[in-house]
Amino acid sequence: DWTIFKPSVIFGDPRGRMEFATQLQRDIIGSPLPAPLFYPGLLPFGAGRFELSPVHVEDVASAFVTALQTPDTIGRTIALGGPSRLSWRQILETLAAVAGKRKLMLPVPALGISMAAVMLDRFEDFPITRDQIKMLLEGNVCDSSGLTELGITARPFDASNLLYLNNSNEGPETWHQNAA
């Protein structure tokens, strides 16, 4: 018997490990450099508009447990997405707000950064790989109906569910506790 889960990007308290929001907070929001709004092609139309539907790690864990107890899930593939489709820009703006920062954002051609990643992604400090850029531009969205079917209310990607970032050892010491 099997059930396959296909979650969108997962966020939530990583308990000392790296996850989606923690990595973005450390590598992009915490960086003195402007945040990249990637775009395909040669002109910056649509920079940062590709969408993701972040899903909370505890919602994913609840889905696993519920599926083990629900025979109707056997032999199914269940997409797990958060309650909202958010653009890359919206995600970065949310993370900046949680950090208590205003972050400059600039259009960056995906082709250029992909070429740089070919040469630099083998270095640990290079913040993004070619595969990550490709996945971001393709988007990673699904709705929360998989969670709803399992009786789980999806948590939004918002300040109240990102407060763990304020306690993270991965980011700047200046993150504010009052991001809500």
What are these regions (language model features)?
Residues A61-I128, V141-A180:
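Mid/C-terminal beta-alpha module of Rossmann-like enzyme folds, strongest
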Residues W2, A21, I133, F157-D158:
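A generic alpha-helix preference that emphasizes hydrophobic side chains
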Residues E19-S53, R102-N140:
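Alpha-helical membrane-targeting segments
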Residues D1-E93, A97:
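Oxidoreductase cofactor-interface core, primarily capturing Rossmann-like NAD(P)-dependent enzymes
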